[in-house]
């Protein structure tokens, strides 16, 4: 799931992804936007 959060590294995406999808969510930075992987 791509969320509207700008990023330069996956670390920046973990907090918003965890907030939205739960503590075990994974995150990647793709094309300057965060992509979350709910588990």
Swiss-Prot record:
One GO MF term attached to the UniProt entry: ion channel inhibitor activity
Q: Provide the disulphide bond pattern.
A: 7-29, 13-34, 17-36
Query: Where does the UniProt annotation locate this protein?
Result: Secreted
Q: In which tissues is it expressed?
A: Expressed by the venom gland.
Marked site (Basic residue of the functional dyad) residue numbers: 28
Know the name of this protein? Answer: Potassium channel toxin alpha-KTx 2.5
SUPFAM superfamilies, sorted: Scorpion toxin-like
Q: Specify the effect of residue 19 to Y.
A: No loss of activity
> What is the recorded phenotype of mutating residue 19 to C?
No loss of activity
Q: What is the lineage of its organism?
A: Eukaryota, Metazoa, Ecdysozoa, Arthropoda, Chelicerata
Keywords (A to Z) from UniProt = Disulfide bond, Ion channel impairing toxin, Neurotoxin, Potassium channel impairing toxin, Secreted, Toxin, Voltage-gated potassium channel impairing toxin
Site (Aromatic residue of the functional dyad): give the residues. Answer: 37
Q: What remark does the entry add?
A: Negative results: does not block Kv1.4/KCNA4 and Kv1.5/KCNA5 currents.
Cellular-component GO terms for this entry: extracellular region
Similarity comment: Belongs to the short scorpion toxin superfamily. Potassium channel inhibitor family. Alpha-KTx 02 subfamily.
Record's comment describing the protein's domains: Has the structural arrangement of an alpha-helix connected to a beta-sheet by disulfide bonds (CSalpha/beta).
């Amino acid at each position: 799931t791509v969320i509207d959060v700008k990023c330069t590294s996956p670390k920046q995406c973990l907090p918003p992804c965890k907030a939205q999808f739960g503590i075990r969510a994974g995150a990647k930075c793709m094309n300057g936007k965060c992509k979350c992987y709910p588990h």
